[in-house]
């Protein structure tokens, strides 16, 4: 969520709510997101949100386009209502050249209406204007997602020690899809944003330029997948990411998570990348402690706000 909500008079606007975007609309939204990211230093819409711009309509996902008279796109919001328990989640952005004209508040109000006034909304990077907009909309802080980083140069981690009977290999597209989706769902049953990924979501990621199965590590015991560490390389930023790390719940507690983390970090170091990053919920004290022991420190924080329940 990125918007300067200090209201100044502007041109008439309209907001259109769509289940599916045309290719031209998708291109316009992506251009808007790129311009906003260039100004703000981070994306206002997550990777999943950007992937959901493309292709046929997705169940539970709607797009809100804010245009001025003449059709100029200056604001975008996405609402996803696929979580069976929590309110719908949203992200929004206003073009940097059109902030301070109430467009963010207009999009926020439209999101509240579309969600039946049950809403969660992200403020990536904790942008001050986004925090103010959340307050104006009557939302309360609900979640803190930390981005942690550590240098990879001079990486000094002990040799990974795998639990007895466990071996590690890399992901084979097509062959391992179903098994990975099942373990991912089990490992993140408490985290629907990750645990609800479908074959289509996986295919979307496999089609991205950054996808590299050589950095997607699978841990097996007796031929069964029990854990994984999927790494990602952000080539332009020369940044490696602990993209997703999951352990099947019935096999947790044996040190596999730490071993897989080490294997992935060593792989990223081998790519010549200077820095590694990952995301972790601030209230996941155990995971935060593990990553801090591995040398990670907080780089920035994404904030989620929601309506009072």
Swiss-Prot record:
**Catalytic function, reaction form:** 1D-myo-inositol 2-(L-cysteinylamino)-2-deoxy-alpha-D-glucopyranoside + acetyl-CoA = mycothiol + CoA + H(+)
Q: Which Pfam families match?
A: Acetyltransf_1, Acetyltransf_7
Give the organism's phylogenetic lineage: Bacteria, Bacillati, Actinomycetota, Actinomycetes, Kitasatosporales
Belongs to which family? Answer: Belongs to the acetyltransferase family. MshD subfamily.
Residue ranges of the N-acetyltransferase domain? Answer: 16-158, 166-309
State the UniProt keywords alphabetically: Acyltransferase, Repeat, Transferase
SUPFAM superfamilies (alphabetical): Acyl-CoA N-acyltransferases (Nat) (SSF55729)
Q: How does it assemble?
A: Monomer.
Q: What EC number(s) does its UniProt record assign?
A: 2.3.1.189
The name of this protein is Mycothiol acetyltransferase
Q: Per the record's keyword annotation, is Transport included, yes or no?
A: no
Q: Where does acetyl-CoA 1 bind?
A: 92-94
């Amino acid at each position: 969520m990125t918007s300067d909500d200090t209201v100044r008079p502007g041109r008439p606007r309209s907001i259109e709510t769509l289940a599916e975007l045309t290719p031209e609309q998708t291109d316009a939204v992506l251009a808007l997101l790129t311009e906003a990211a260039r100004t703000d230093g981070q994306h206002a819409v997550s990777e999943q949100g950007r992937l959901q711009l493309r292709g046929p309509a997705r169940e539970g996902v709607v797009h809100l386009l804010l245009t001025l008279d003449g059709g100029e796109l200056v604001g975008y919001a996405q609402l996803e209502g696929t979580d069976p328990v929590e309110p719908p989640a949203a992200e929004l952005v206003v073009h940097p050249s059109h902030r301070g004209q109430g467009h963010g508040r207009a999009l926020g109000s439209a999101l509240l209406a579309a969600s039946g006034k049950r809403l969660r909304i992200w403020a990536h990077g904790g942008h001050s204007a986004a925090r103010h907009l959340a307050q104006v909309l009557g939302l309360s802080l609900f979640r803190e997602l930390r981005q942690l980083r550590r240098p990879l140069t001079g990486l000094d981690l002990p040799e990974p020690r795998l639990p007895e009977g466990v071996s590690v290999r890399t992901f084979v597209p097509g062959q391992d899809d179903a098994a990975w989706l099942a373990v991912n769902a089990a490992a993140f049953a408490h985290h629907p944003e990750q645990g609800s990924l479908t074959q289509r979501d996986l295919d979307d990621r496999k089609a991205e330029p950054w996808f590299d199965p050589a950095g997607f590590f699978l841990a097996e015991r007796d031929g069964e997948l029990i854990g994984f560490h999927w790494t990602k390389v952000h080539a332009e930023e020369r940044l490696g990411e602990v993209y997703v790390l999951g352990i099947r719940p019935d096999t947790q507690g044996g040190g596999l998570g730490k071993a897989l983390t080490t294997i992935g970090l060593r792989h990223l170091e081998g790519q010549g990348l200077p820095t590694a990053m990952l995301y972790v919920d601030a209230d996941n004290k155990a995971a935060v402690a593990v990553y801090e022991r591995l040398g990670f420190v907080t780089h920035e924080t994404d904030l989620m706000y929601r309506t009072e329940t």
